[in-house]
Structure formats: structure tokens, C-alpha cells
Amino acid sequence: MELKIDDLNQNPKLGSSDRPNSYIGRSVPRERAKKLLEGKGNYVDDIALPRMVHLNFIRSPFAHAKIISINISKAKNVSGVYEIFTIKDIEKVCTPWNGVLGHLGEMRSPTQFPLAKDFVRWQGEPVAVVVAKNRAIAEDASELVEIDYQEIDAQLDMETALSENTQIIHKELGNNLFWTRTVDQGNINDAFKNAYKVVETTLDFARHTGVTLESRGIIADWNSSEEKMTVYHNGQAPHMMQSIIAKHLQISEGLVRIISCDVGGSFGIKVHVYPDEMVAVAVSKIMNRPVKYIADRLESYSTDIHSRCHKIYGKLGVDDKGKIIAFEIDDLSGIGPYSVYPRTSAIETNQVLNLSAASYVVPNYKAKGTVVFQNKTPMCQYRAVGHPIAVAITEALVDKAASECNIDRFEFRKNNLIPDNAYPTKTPSGVPLEDLSHHACIEKLKKLMNIDELERYKKESLIKGRYKGFSIINMVEVTNPSPLFYGVGGAPISSQDGASIRLEGSGAVHVSSSITEQGQGTEAIMQQIAADQLGVNIDTVRVTLGDTDTTPYGGGTWASRGAGIGGEAVLKASRQLKNNILKIAAVIMQTKENDLDVRDDNVVRKDGGKGMSLKELAQTVYYRGHELPPGTNPELITTSSFLIEGIPFVFTNSAMGCLVDVDIDTGLIKIEKFWAVEDCGTQINPKLVEEQIKGGVVQGIGGALYEENIYDEYGNLVNGNMADYLVPMAYEMPDIIVDHVVTNSGRSILGAKGAGEAGTGGAPAAIMNAVNDALKVKNVEVTSQPITPEKILIALGKI
């Protein structure tokens, strides 16, 4: 019988704290943090290559217009300007694309070009590009490029996008519909007819975007002698970009190298294909020299993908025992003029349909999603894709139903949540669920919050004229996606990840992983897993990420998959390497491999006899192989890959609560406390998990209370700067209390699920419900996010 690595007795139970070099489950400081805090990071903009030129884009000042002419003659005469390109030049070397996925039904997305062709369809769309000695010269020359436009009425309102007389953005499509989908499970009409109580609401979610510390940036360097393209890019998925650049610039994929340097945040913003970045690569190929483009902050607001932008109607029916018997939603979303490539702009709506009511037992479920085009910045996936909308509509209706039935909202949820012993099961929409713990999480949340005390606090505050409210919400979170998410639809997006691990001649360990790092601590958890499974000190483990020439093929970092998929690949490769080490050591030490183990960088005998260091073993293999018996396998490097099979995602679940104070005179909202109980399976580094949840909550606060991309009636983005686009800062951060339930994923040895998006997905619902709880005594509610002071005062009838 073939020996399986997972069966070897030297593989310890994960998180064995009584064992030397046990790192899984420990809050180990991340090594990379020291480098970044000392200002020694290496970001795209830090790189300067010989002969490098700089780009500045001339962008459309209009939301919708026809391009009549482009005159570049004056700008080309500026000293230091090398070239000025329009789509006529760029399309010769870079083909256009369509943002569609084959498995989600008909998507009607027009072809998108790297630069605008004939028409501009959002304010900020790139029309031409100036190539100059430096960015300042390029910007000055851009002022001299003369573009004549014929302005066209902009279609901005998603609610009128399909009206009979509306402006059609792409005439060839006949209307402004991109995609629609309907889910229909059970008999929704009969269920509502027979319902004891029916509640309904409509919620609005404003557009907002991810404001990363580092803006998007790219350096492309075409080497014509080797026909090789090297790209320095601050993205999340190097192998995806390698495939796409190779395809659209007609380069052999193996001759495209993507290097992701240090990346200053992403949140999903940097996992998409942007026209300006493809132009940079095309210009490098045309000019045969390095090209740099760094988006400035004004460009970021008008060109980085936006998100949310939903209006959703929901209806919930219960029987006379307070059991949910019917749930229906109708979601409308506007995505800008194009579906973003290659992930498409349908996924957020698709996740709303999949995830609404996903925590609850719902026998009859109907959901419709409609996605339309607008003359605004393109919209696509951003942290917690679809979750804030799905969770908010679900939990708003659950609160309403509990109130209508005169049942405590905690008890109402307990009576309707999927039981913890019911798995495997499915969401109301039919998506498989495994290994969740809604009841355990909500019970722990109740104890953390001390709900009885909160009720007393509310009443006492009201006597003093202060309006307090609190909430309880439940959610599921999509993590660890499989090929059934994107690959099945034909997108060049890998769902598997790989890891290579090598024992160096010094006895140190080198890990190479296809996962990438944008600040979440990926490098640290890879070190921990490798050190734990090999039995070495973590200081001896070095990690390489983000280079398609030196790392195994894989998907990179998105959808909370780094630990669950990339970490599993490292674990498997570590166990294989350890197995090889012990086999070689057994030959050298003339014993059985099962009598040996690796601890503290040494191969040790379990009976306490003399062992040998990993350095000694490595140098014997690498330098003195003649000392090994013939036939000994000297392999001290192993590679392993991992992917989820059979289901589209591995889900996690959370329960959250929020306490707010609403000032009814000013409309100001203060979050006094926030609680989150998360079940993400095995926690490799609890401190990093806590940081992810807290950071996610703060981004959720941004969407709930502050962040909105505001457009005027002509399609001009009026708050595209850091002064006018509000984000939560240190003062707005409440006390966030995090706790956990641990239900390991049965899909892997490591048992890890994702934790990066729960806070962002759940916080908006928790905040909205808490605000409405505070306003309940006034018999008013708010149904639009962000919940600004103005909206509070309007609801109260004060303005």
C-alpha cells in the first residue's frame, strides 16, 4: 500500500502548542512589516529603469460624447515629448476585449478598446496618451492636445435605463440591458398568499470605491531582441495578467513576466484589467523601451472600478409560529458603460441573488437581478462583492418580521437560522453550504453584547434624550472559490494555487507561492505554515511571492482565498519536503524514517539518540552526493498545488452586532461599539485574522455612513478627491470586539476558510439596523446608504 504523506506519524496535529516550532495558531509578528515601517518597501513608483518614459492620459471631460477630431500637432512640438498615441496607433498592437462569462447566461457587453474609439462613455475614459521624458512634461503637453467632441445626453439613472425613450449608450445593443437572472425555488406566490405576516422594504446603496494607500501603477519593458515583456505591476493576480497581456498583445505567454512588487492595498480594486494599463504595455511594445504610468489620486476616483450602486426591493413572509416561509428580492444595479474584463460586472448582482437569506431556512425563494449600463465609471468587484446588499436586505426584513410578529429579534433569528447540525445543505438560492455554525456564533455574540444590559442602556438613555440602538445580524461569506466560480465561464482566472519549497544548502527554507501580498499578511502565514510543518524555526523561512518567472502558477489573492487555498498548497509541499528529508536522513543515519522527526532545524531521533542538522543534511546532498547509497533520491525541493473541487465556494459565517447613538438634532451617528463573531476555520495567525475583521468593519462603516461617488446631472464626478470623498478615519473607528467559533473546513487538511471580507459585508447591515432601532421610537427609518446626517433629518421631518 502506497504511503500517503498525510498519514505519516511525524505530521503533528495542527496547532500543537506543546511541540517545538509550532506556529499554526500563533500570533507571530509579520516580518515584512518592519521593512515597510522603515520606509524600505519597493513599490512600482520606486522603480526607475534606463531609457524609461512616462505617460499621461488625456481623458474625456464628458460622460457621453462623439469624438469628432483629435489634433496633436501642438503637443508634439513640446520639448521632451516623444510620442502621442490615439486608438488608431494602439489597436495595431493591442486587441480589444469583452467582459463576459459563458456560464451565467447571455451577457450583452460591447467590445472595449484600450483607448476610446469614436465615442466616449464616461467622464475619465482615456482618449489619447502623451509619452514624455517625465510626467510633468507629459501633463503640460496634454493641455495642448485639441479634441473636438459632440456632446450626447448622458444616461445616468439606472431606474430609467430601460425606459422607452432613454438614451441608448451602445446603439448596436438596442437598449441598455447588460444582464439579467432570475432564481425561483419552491412556490413563492402560494407561500405569500398563505403567510401570517408579510413585510417588505426597499434599500438604496450608493456607488463607492476602494481608496487604497497606493494608487494603481505599472511599468512595462519590452525587449525586442528576446521578444519578452517584463511588467512591474501592483496587482493581485500576476498569472492572470500574464495570460491577458500575452493574448491581447500577441506575445508568447512564457515570454511575459509579471512582477508584483510591494503593494499598498488593493481590496479587489487591483484585480481587474484597466484600459490605461493595457495602453502602457502597448506603448512599450511600440517604442521598445520601458514605460511608466502611475495613476494620480484624481484619476483613481474616476477610473478605479466603483462598486455597489444597487436598489433592491425585498419581501418576507412568515407563518403564525414566526417561521420564514417565503423570501423575494428584486435587485437593480448600474455598472457604467462596460462590463469590466475579465471578471465581468455581473458578479456583484449574482452574489446578491446567491447570498440573500443564505443564513436562514427558506423553503420558497425568488430573486431577480437586472444589470444596466450607465454613463459613469465602470463598476466591478470590490471587497465583499455583493455581501453588503444581500446581508442588509435580509437582516432589515428579518428585523421587520420579528417586530411584526412581536418576537424578540434574537429569538426570531435562532428559530430560523440553519441548524448547526444540518450540513451539508444549500442556500435558498441553491448554492451548497458546508461546515457552518450560525447558532454557535449568535449565542456567543449574545453573551459578548450582553443584550439585557443594552436594552437597559437604551431605556436609560432615552429618558435623558439620547437615542441609542443596537443590532444583531447574521451572514455567510464567500471564500476559497473553485473553478466553478470563474474558470467554468471561460475566464483566464486560476482557482488553484501552487507552492514550491526548497531546503537551502545553509539549512534555511525557501517558499515560493503563487499567492500575493497587498498588506494582509500573506507572507507571514506562509512562513508559519512551512515552519510548523517542517519543524524549523520561522526565522529560517524566506518567502517569494508575485513573480510569474519564479513562482508556481496560481490565482493570486482575491475572494479571501490566500490561506485556504494558497496555505493548503504550502502545507502539502512542506509535508512532501519533510518526507523527503526524513527518507534521506534515514539512509544517512541508517535507521527508519518513522523513527525520526525534524525539530529546531535538526533531524532528531525520537529515542533521543544523536541526529543531524538540516544544514549538514543539505550539504551532504548538494556537495557530497557520492556519500549517499546508489539510488537515493536527492530531491530537496517539492512543489504542490491545491484547488477546491465539487462546490463553487467554501463559505464562512459570522454574527455581528452594533451599538449606535443617533443625535436627532444634528443627524450625526456615532458608533459606540461593534461586535463580530467569526467562524473562519483554522486561524493560522489569530492577530492577522483580527486585523482583517477590524479593517473590514471599518470599510463597511465607510460604505454605511460616509462613502459615495457623487455625480451631477451631466455625469460629472463632483467629489473625486480626498477632500470631498469621505472615508472613516481614526476618530470614526469604534471599539471593535472580535471573537471566534472554530468549525474547520472539511475540504482541506489545514481547515482554513477566508476571513478578509466579513467585516465589510456585514457592517453596513449591522449599522443600518442599529440606526433604525434607535429611530424606532420616532416611528421612522432610513433605507439609503450612506446614512448621512441629512438623511436622518429628512426621515425625522426636520428638513
Set out the residue ranges of the language-model regions.
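C-terminal catalytic domains of large/alpha subunits in multi-subunit enzymes
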Residues: 2, 87-88, 250-255, 285-293, ...
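Glycine-rich loop/linker segments at domain edges
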Residues: 26, 32-38, 104-110, 175-218, ...
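Short beta-strand elements
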Residues: 41, 217-222, 311-320, 326-331, ...
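Short acidic, glycine/serine/threonine-rich loops at helix termini
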Residues: 94-99, 141-144, 233, 242-244, ...
